[in-house]
Amino acid sequence: MLADLSEALRERQQEGLYRSRPVLEGPQSPHVTIDGRDFLAFCSNDYLGLANHPALIEAAAEGARCYGVGSGASHLISGHFRAHHELEEALAAFVGLPRTLLFSTGYMANMAVVTALAGRGDAIFADRLNHASLNDAALLSRARFIRYPHLDLDTLARQLETTKARRRLVVTDAVFSMDGDMAPVAELLTLCQRFDAWLLLDDAHGFGVLGERGKGSLYHSQRIERDTPYLIYMATLGKAAGVSGAFVAAQAPVVETLIQHGRTYGYTTAAPPLLAHTLLTSLQLISQESWRRERLALLIERLRQRLHSLPWPLLLSETPIQPLLVGESQEAVRLDLALRERGIWVPAIRPPTVPQGMARLRISLSAVHTEADVDRLGAALRDLAQC
């Protein structure tokens, strides 16, 4: 059996698909030390630059002094601390939905929602470019799993119209993690209301970045109706929020159903309460420091100007995710390694994370990048385009 595994690993390496784990030797930042070398990095999801913020470091220390470093039990036994409860209430008020429920990861949050609400006899409708967690959850639920072409609402409408399923659940990324484009949330909600379907919106990459005071994709457009029983909202707390975890926001009966039937909620140790305590401070910074989002917008515009004439197209995106489409995996890896030689870290994204022939450099920006950082990346890529 080990020989089979070794052969499969060799084949993966020959195809340019082998993955390895870089080891960071300091805090998350645009300037990092990896395996003993200093790099300018454009690959983290720390969009607002909060992961190493002094106020969050102090809040984490305060949380540890108050609650210790481990929760010791699941939320349903004795692992639900005051800090968890206060954060859930603060998040509900922030996103404007009645209730929220904390999870250790976005993957676990999506898994809980989909498997608790859908099963045999039900149907799940999914955008073809959704995150793996939504796909895995749909498969595990044993509901009928129906995918529609990326952002193709006409096809989705036909699928919803013809289904005989007992329950219908539409699942989609709000901001697509590998393309940086956004789902038409208002139109999706209208469809779901028309066909009596829930909409699970995964806003992992929009929360903190988009909308009024960073409230996320629900606030990116004035046309989005948030006071509806059809909406289920998920966002993560380890990206723009700079810490760790995730939450689901919805009407009270949905949240109570997740508490009763969400297996990834009830059958796991709760996240340390010190993280929830830290996230209360993070939420204040997200809400109050609008300059971070304003700066991100300026950096996004600057990057797109610097890269517009390259032979590799930059996909359309107004978010911090700026994918440079390369094509073949080997070419993406070549660019990745050539940038590393120049002290710049932008890992290649290859299948199966993206479709075959769609390998790319996923450039992600942070509010704490500088104009000089962006210019340096642009100059390096223009130089490589001549090679």
From Swiss-Prot:
Pfam families linked to this entry: Aminotran_1_2
InterPro entries: Aminotransferase_I/II_large, AON_synthase_class-II, AONS_Archaea/Proteobacteria, AONS_Proteobacteria, PyrdxlP-dep_Trfase, PyrdxlP-dep_Trfase_major, PyrdxlP-dep_Trfase_small
Keywords assigned: Biotin biosynthesis, Pyridoxal phosphate, Transferase
Tagged with keyword Disulfide bond: no
Keyword hit for Lipid metabolism: no
Required cofactor(s): pyridoxal 5'-phosphate
Pathway info: Cofactor biosynthesis; biotin biosynthesis
Catalytic activity: 6-carboxyhexanoyl-[ACP] + L-alanine + H(+) = (8S)-8-amino-7-oxononanoate + holo-[ACP] + CO2
GO molecular function term, any single one: pyridoxal phosphate binding
Uppermost EC category: transferase
GO biological process: one example: biotin biosynthetic process
Residue numbers binding pyridoxal 5'-phosphate: G106, Y107, S177, H205, T236
E.C. no: 2.3.1.47
Annotated positions of the N6-(pyridoxal phosphate)lysine modification: K239
Protein residues bound to substrate: R19, H131, T353
Tree of life domain: Bacteria
Subunit-level organization: Homodimer.
Free-text function comment from the UniProt entry: Catalyzes the decarboxylative condensation of pimeloyl-[acyl-carrier protein] and L-alanine to produce 8-amino-7-oxononanoate (AON), [acyl-carrier protein], and carbon dioxide.
Protein family membership: Belongs to the class-II pyridoxal-phosphate-dependent aminotransferase family. BioF subfamily.
HAMAP family noted in UniProt: BioF_aminotrans_2 (MF_01693)
Protein name stated in the entry: 8-amino-7-oxononanoate synthase
Organism this protein belongs to: Nitrosomonas europaea (strain ATCC 19718 / CIP 103999 / KCTC 2705 / NBRC 14298)
